[in-house]
Amino acid sequence: VKGLSIFYIFIALLMFGLLNQQHLYLNIIAIILALLVLVGLFKIEQKQNNPFLPTNEFNRSIMLAFITDLFIAMSLIGYNLYIPVYLQEQLGLSPLQSGFVILPLSVAWIILNFNLAKIEANFTRKALYISAFTVLLICSVIILFGMKVPLLIAFSVIFAGLSFGYVYTKNSVIVQEESSPRNMKKMMSFYALTKNLGSSVGSTIMGYM
């Protein structure tokens, strides 16, 4: 009960930090407090026999999965939300046309999922993660300087989709494989929450921009 209560305090502070639109300094303070509460939650749960948050499951690989998923979710909301809006409002494309521009991202994601086992057989996990984030960074730079060329955007999001697809899929597999059967459902729930928080943070950033 204590861990759950602290967790709700963390969520409340985080949501206030993301949603408040009155004073920016209040957002910053709330987010800092949320992070401090989260650290406190980990320390408290480590001392519990039956913890709400299974801290013993957070090994290096799972921590990496949670952190990368948070940032990937923040980035993905920019692709899915900002690019279509920009294409419609700034370039005058119809909703259907802007949808077709961003469609290759989803297609590439699906294709990668069907071929992930073959890819992993030839490369290490570290190499694939570094490649995925490098490709995503390059795609973002290309889109940044080619925002007035829809065909270039459509071409770039193909490779972005491959990056998003690998990181999302592999992170999910890591959490499932490296969590104990007893706590796997809890860990997958926290994993899903992390993705949702990343999307919320990304949406907030887009809103401020």
Map each language-model feature to its residues.
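12-transmembrane solute porter fold
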Residues: P51-M209
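Hydrophobic transmembrane-helix bundles of small-molecule transporters
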Residues: V1-T68
